[in-house]
UniProtKB/Swiss-Prot annotation:
Protein name: Ubiquinone/menaquinone biosynthesis C-methyltransferase UbiE
EC number(s) per entry: 2.1.1.163, 2.1.1.201
Keywords, ordered alphabetically: Menaquinone biosynthesis, Methyltransferase, S-adenosyl-L-methionine, Transferase, Ubiquinone biosynthesis
One Gene Ontology term of the molecular function aspect: 2-methoxy-6-polyprenyl-1,4-benzoquinol methyltransferase activity
Entry keyword Transferase: yes
UniProt source species: Stutzerimonas stutzeri (strain A1501)
Binding site for S-adenosyl-L-methionine: 79, 100, 128-129
Name of the gene this protein is made from: ubiE
NCBIfam families, A to Z: MenG_MenH_UbiE, PRK00216.1-1, PRK00216.1-5
Family assignment from sequence similarity: Belongs to the class I-like SAM-binding methyltransferase superfamily. MenG/UbiE family.
Gene3D superfamilies: Vaccinia Virus protein VP39
PROSITE patterns: SAM_MT_UBIE, UBIE_1, UBIE_2
GO BP: any one term: methylation
Organism lineage: Bacteria, Pseudomonadati, Pseudomonadota, Gammaproteobacteria, Pseudomonadales
């Protein structure tokens, strides 16, 4: 017979891909995935998407409305694709913060950007999206690209992003989502669960991390659900754009 006190005290669980794990373990498990893939992350992005991820990110930059002198926060900024472009846009009077919870990804991003001569207006900060270590009403734009699905408490992260934005500031969430066509969805599933882990094994000698990435995409809220989460957090004029048949969606919300 189950002890009701133990049941009451049991730690809440959350999904890690298709598995349920204690909430306290998810961040560490996600960290292990990205420690494993960090060195080959850019190469795998190009192979997995056929380079289309660059177009998705370009559209994110355009929709952000970033301009000279702005302060930008690039959460889960990883290897710095968005940060590099934002650094050019905001210029010497602006500021871009590349934040990532994973030290390995942050190091790869810092090294890559320094090699490309991106410095001066960029800071690198190891930070948890759920508890952002920045002042209230500080940033003009906050972005999170392909990172929200790995966050344990997504509502807390969205609320934290709202807090650090200035009134009128924009949040942009670029994330894998739900394909809008049923036949396309089946083909995408076959690719994600067969070819993707195989590529991970060949390129990084790690099929399990890429199996997790595929599973995490399926467990992420769909377009309308994420829109509702942003509205519930307090964002206004929330909208989203499906790209590549809904494989990816870009959500945008404004802080009132």
């Amino acid at each position: 017979m189950t002890d009701p006190r133990k049941a009451h005290d049991a730690e809440p669980t959350t999904h890690f891909g298709y598995k349920n794990v204690p909430e306290s373990q998810k961040a560490q498990k996600v960290a292990e995935v990205f420690h494993s893939v960090a060195a080959k992350y850019d190469l795998m992005n190009d192979l997995m998407s056929g380079g289309i991820h660059r177009l998705w990110k370009r559209f994110t930059i355009e929709l952000s409305g970033a301009r000279h002198g702005n302060r930008i926060l690039d959460i889960a900024g990883g290897t710095g694709d968005l940060t590099r472009q934002f650094s050019r846009i905001v210029g010497p009077t602006g500021e871009v913060v590349l934040a990532d919870i994973n030290a390995s990804m942050l190091k790869v991003g810092r090294d890559k950007l320094l090699d490309k001569g991106v410095a001066g207006n960029v800071r690198f900060v190891q930070a948890d999206a759920e508890k952002l270590p920045f002042p209230d009403n500080y940033f003009d734009v906050v972005t999170i690209a392909f990172g929200l699905r790995n966050v344990t408490h997504k509502e807390d992260a969205i609320a934290s992003m709202l807090r650090v934005l200035k009134p009128g500031g924009r949040l942009l969430v670029l994330e894998f989502s739900k394909p809008t066509n049923q036949l396309f969805s089946k083909a995408y599933d076959a690719y994600s669960f067969s070819l993707l882990p195989m590529m991970g094994k060949l390129i990084t000698n790690d099929s399990e991390s890429y199996r997790y990435l595929a599973e995490s995409i399926r467990m992420h809220p769909d377009q309308e659900t994420l829109k509702g989460m942003m509205e519930a957090a307090g964002f206004e004029r929330v909208s989203y754009h499906n790209m590549t048949g809904g494989i990816v969606a870009l959500h945008r919300g404004i802080k009132p």
